[in-house]
Regions:
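Histidine-centered divalent metal-coordination motifs
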Residues: 69-71, 215, 265
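Conserved N-terminal glycine/acidic-rich loop preference
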Residues: 211-214, 238-248, 269-287
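Active-site flanking residues adjacent to catalytic metal/cofactor-binding acidic residues
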Residues: 214, 264, 327-329
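Active-site gating/metal-coordination segments in enzymes
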Residues: 116-244
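Active-site gating loops and adjacent loop-to-helix segments of metal-dependent hydrolytic enzymes
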Residues: 10-17, 71-95, 124-126, 131, ...
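Active-site environment of divalent metal-dependent phosphoester hydrolases
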Residues: 73-75, 120-122, 161-162, 190, ...
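Mid-to-C-terminal alpha-helical segments outside catalytic/metal-binding sites
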Residues: 2-50, 57-64, 68, 74-111, ...
Length: 371
């Protein structure tokens, strides 16, 4: 997303930094920072980190960032997506491992955690195909991790409507491939992630204290509603909100507290709707949410791909602390330059930039390297 001139928030040559604390952004944190303390350590994060000099060139950009939203799209997955009769939308962009590495190097990304994007591996109810495709994709991603030490991690794909196949693939992904987590979509047909049938899958993920990354999809309910506007332009953000709310209001967030969730695109529209969900919980008087939904929303993690404009960041940081925010690019649909520019325009403090770019991801994914 383009950042407007107004969103740059640049006054003369003075660096205007923000720091988000435990309860988000407030006016006390919007003042000018004096001295050079806010710049400490930013040079290692490259030209678009916090208040780093715009004179720095990409060639000097140290590789430090961890990208938790980075897609891999091998040719056999494209073939499956584009098979006749499938409602999978436009053909995905061209991709190769070399293209990923090139953008990572240009953007200062040390490690990208690979995941697949919509439409995933489940087409209709053909579990045999989804199992085969998941295994092929997970093996492909694991080979990239092995072939490029330190550069990639892996969120392995499963299809939760297939309980037996999912449990088998979870075991294979963690025990054989040593995957870093599991990647899910926001919905599967008419099932969102709070669906009762998914409980056995979550029991196993909770037992393993798994990291679960969730990517939006275009839901079956809402295709072609607005002429001339691709459904993903609206529905990706909305489907993320639906599934996050479903996880919380189903009781799964409380029932499975050891699953570490990461949601895409700054949580979609969720940060703008927390008041509505709080009132809903008060009206329902749900014993599973004695303190309302907000404490559960605040336990989750949110990455910034296509969610890094000033308005989006303001809303997100009123909902959660910076400790729950992670760096993501959505490559190859977007690139690292976009999110780097968004983070720089917001003028985070140096400490917050370090946390978003690397530190917060390492808390969940320590295998990816030293702090």
């Amino acid at each position: 997303m383009a950042i407007s001139d107004q969103g740059q928030r640049t006054l003369s040559n003075t660096c205007f930094c923000r720091s988000a604390g435990a309860t988000g952004v407030d006016s006390a944190r919007r003042g000018f920072l004096t001295g050079a303390a806010a710049l400490a350590g930013l040079s290692a994060l490259g030209p678009t980190a916090g208040c780093a000099s715009s004179a720095t060139t990409p060639a000097t950009l140290a590789r430090t960032r961890i990208d938790v939203h980075h897609h891999f799209i091998p040719p056999f997955h494209v073939d499956a997506m584009m098979a006749p009769g499938r409602r999978t939308g436009a053909r995905p962009p061209k991709w190769s491992p070399a293209m990923s590495l090139d953008d990572m190097d240009k953007s200062g990304i040390a490690t990208a955690v690979l995941s697949i994007a919509q439409p995933g591996v489940l087409f209709g109810s053909d579990f045999a195909e989804s199992r085969r495709l998941a295994r092929e994709l997970n093996d492909y991603g694991a080979k990239m991790v092995r072939d490029h030490p330190g550069r990639f991690g892996l969120f392995a794909v499963i299809a939760p409507p297939d309980t037996e196949g999912s449990l088998r693939e979870i075991a294979y992904a963690f025990d054989v491939l040593k995957a870093d987590g599991i990647g899910l979509l926001t919905s599967y047909g008419d099932k969102y992630l709070g669906d009762p049938s998914f409980a056995p899958v979550y029991e196993e993920l909770n037992r393993r204290k798994a990291v679960v990354y969730v990517h939006p999809t275009t839901p079956d309910c809402c295709r072609g509603l607005v002429p001339g506007i691709p459904p993903g332009s609206i529905e990706y953000a909305t489907d993320s909100t639906r599934t996050i709310a479903h996880i919380v209001f189903s009781g799964y967030a409380v029932r499975f507290p050891d699953i570490r969730w990461i949601f895409s695109h700054s949580g979609g529209t969720l940060p703008f709707l927390t008041g509505r969900f709080t009132r809903l919980a008060e009206e329902k008087k749900d014993p599973r949410l004695p303190d309302g939904p907000l404490p559960e929303f605040r336990k989750f993690h949110y990455e910034l791909a296509q969610g890094n404009t000033p308005g989006q960041l303001d809303a997100l940081l009123r909902m959660v602390s910076v400790s729950q925010v992670m760096y993501g690019t959505d490559y190859p649909f977007r690139d690292g330059a976009e999110v780097n520019a968004g983070i720089a325009a917001y003028r985070f403090s140096a400490a917050d930039v370090r946390a978003i770019a690397r530190g917060n991801a390492l808390r969940l994914l320590p295998r990816l390297g030293p702090a």
